[in-house]
Curated annotation (Swiss-Prot):
UniProt GO MF annotations: dITP diphosphatase activity; ITP diphosphatase activity; metal ion binding; nucleotide binding; ribonucleoside triphosphate phosphatase activity; XTP diphosphatase activity
Protein name in UniProt: dITP/XTP pyrophosphatase
EC number(s) from the headed UniProt entry: 3.6.1.66
Organismal lineage: Bacteria, Pseudomonadati, Campylobacterota, Epsilonproteobacteria, Campylobacterales
Family to which this protein belongs: Belongs to the HAM1 NTPase family.
Amino acid sequence: MKIVLASANKGKIKEFERLLPNDEIVAFSEILGKIEIDEDKDTFKGNAIKKAQTIYDELQKINFGDVVVISDDSGISVPVLGNAPGVYSARYAGLNASDKENNEKLKAELNKLGLEKTPAFYTACIAIVYKNEVYTVHGWMYGEVLNKEIGTNGFGYDPMFIPNGYDKTLGELDEGVKKEFSHRSKALKLAMKVLEVIL
């Protein structure tokens, strides 16, 4: 089955390809070119649905045919910071901020509170649009966020996050290990069950 991913984030695309090796994953930009989608909802679910529905609607305009569009919205939440960055994780340091800039901002916020580490959790919401029906699933990963980066694997806040049950950051852990328990892989396992039912 061809699955169109409503994301231009190369890190996310690679992760979806690893988690769904038997499906043809195509980034929407390969078909539609550049489309800016304003992630203006205040929940991960709202943003995921908006992205998937927007891309699905654009594909219908060009008569792309039977297609599954999958989108995710995800981020890290730090309770001591009022669950920030939350839905603003990708733009915590500003619109078009790099991973490095976002990490620096989070470190600065933790340092203001004198925290070397504190509880945090990742949330992933996956939205699936097929035959104009919308389905959503969630996955979570709990652990601690550090005020420093360790390791170079992964993307985003991975080098700052130690998942529960581990003594290394996601930036230090092998991608195969992360695949077993990440918020996105948990959500994708549920998404696979949805796809089995609807396809």
